[in-house]
């Protein structure tokens, strides 16, 4: 120990309890308050603002997604109804065209039958007229033959 005093070394060493330890503790506390005021609070505020923004954005996105799904369902229903109405219009048009086709076919058949009947009546009339004329001519010819035979005797 005497040698330590000769060289001017102080006693204690690592665990000296002098004014530096409380001074260091005060510096740590002061630095903690300064860092808290200058760094941690603003960063915490930014993180909280960002979290609020993300939560708000997610809520708005969910709301918009629900709106889009509702609109999609509405449009699907409208499309389904429009297809159904179009199919009904098509089937009604097909029925109408089939009805018109049948009416036109019946009209054409009745006109053809009427025309055929008219032609048959005209043919019958002409045949009857030809038969009457032929009978008249044959009667005249028969009378002429009888006259010639009687005149020849």
From Swiss-Prot:
Gene: atpF2
Topological category with respect to the lipid bilayer: Single-pass membrane protein
Keywords: ATP synthesis, CF(0), Hydrogen ion transport, Ion transport, Membrane, Thylakoid, Transmembrane, Transmembrane helix, Transport
Gene Ontology molecular functions: proton-transporting ATP synthase activity, rotational mechanism; proton-transporting ATPase activity, rotational mechanism
Subunit structure as annotated in this protein's UniProt entry: F-type ATPases have 2 components, F(1) - the catalytic core - and F(0) - the membrane proton channel. F(1) has five subunits: alpha(3), beta(3), gamma(1), delta(1), epsilon(1). F(0) has four main subunits: a(1), b(1), b'(1) and c(10-14). The alpha and beta chains form an alternating ring which encloses part of the gamma chain. F(1) is attached to F(0) by a central stalk formed by the gamma and epsilon chains, while a peripheral stalk is formed by the delta, b and b' chains.
Residue stretches spanning the membrane: 20-40
Name the record gives this protein: ATP synthase subunit b'
One Pfam family of this chain: ATP-synt_B
GO cellular component labels: plasma membrane-derived thylakoid membrane; proton-transporting ATP synthase complex
Chief place of localization: membrane
Location in or out of the cell: Cellular thylakoid membrane
Protein's UniProt keywords contain Transmembrane: yes
The keyword Repressor is annotated on this UniProt entry: no
UniProt cross-references to HAMAP family, sorted A to Z: ATP_synth_b_bprime (MF_01398), ATP_synth_bprime (MF_01399)
PANTHER family: ATP SYNTHASE SUBUNIT B', CHLOROPLASTIC (PTHR33445:SF2)
Family: Belongs to the ATPase B chain family.
Role description: F(1)F(0) ATP synthase produces ATP from ADP in the presence of a proton or sodium gradient. F-type ATPases consist of two structural domains, F(1) containing the extramembraneous catalytic core and F(0) containing the membrane proton channel, linked together by a central stalk and a peripheral stalk. During catalysis, ATP synthesis in the catalytic domain of F(1) is coupled via a rotary mechanism of the central stalk subunits to proton translocation. Component of the F(0) channel, it forms part of the peripheral stalk, linking F(1) to F(0). The b'-subunit is a diverged and duplicated form of b found in plants and photosynthetic bacteria.
Domain of life: Bacteria
